[in-house]
A protein has these predicted regions:
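Conserved PLP-enzyme active-site core in the AAT-like
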Residues: 6-179
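Helix-enriched interaction subdomains in cytosolic or periplasmic regions
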Residues: 2-3
Length: 184
């Protein structure tokens, strides 16, 4: 659906931003083995994305959740440290602003701070719940969406538009331009 396409688009921008312009010419063959971080609650689009981008599903490091099924940031930090020690490049953390099965909202502010410290792309899958950020009663973590490098939204969930209405928001528009522009 539109949400899957929006999320994949955001991770393509992350791949280009982190691995550089050479990834377009050389593919992944000269790139370090990369890792993506997400919980088991993350929608299945992520497996599709890493497969389509040539990383393979083994590039996903699954982060534990807390009792509310939100990403455990202590475990996330440990996973990142362990992967760095093993020689992997932490490429992106994927948080959920409302999971499909439970509506759980990951601790966005804490994840953003960790990603900033670690210099890792921070993506939010907001297809299911990001639209709720406009509500005065929105949870504090939904009010922090602007801390992400990219956010995917899907207007057919809450905004009553037809399917294939995915949207990608990025902190720096040049990441999308650099990813998809071709010189003629």
């Amino acid at each position: 659906s539109g949400g899957t396409v929006a999320n994949i688009t955001a991770l393509l921008a992350a791949r280009r931003a982190v691995l550089g312009a050479e990834v377009r010419r050389d593919g992944l063959r000269n790139s370090p083995q990369s890792r993506f971080y997400a919980t088991v609650e993350t929608h299945a689009w992520l497996e599709k994305a890493v497969d389509m981008m040539g990383f393979g599903e083994a590039a996903i490091t699954r982060v534990e959740t807390d009792a509310q099924l939100r990403m455990d940031t202590v475990h996330l930090a440990a996973c990142i440290a362990e992967d760095r020690k093993a020689g992997y490049l932490p490429l992106a953390v994927v948080a959920s602003a409302g999971t499909v099965s439970t509506g759980a909202i990951d601790p966005i502010k804490a994840i953003a701070a960790l990603c900033c410290r670690e210099k890792i792309w921070f993506h939010i899958d907001g297809c299911y719940g990001a639209a709720a950020a406009i509500l005065p009663s929105a949870p504090a973590d939904l009010q922090c969406l602007g801390l992400a490098d990219s956010i995917a939204m899907d207007a057919h969930k809450w905004l009553y538009v037809p399917l294939e209405a995915g949207c990608v928001l990025v902190k720096d528009k040049n990441h999308l331009v650099d990813t998809f522009a071709h010189e003629t």
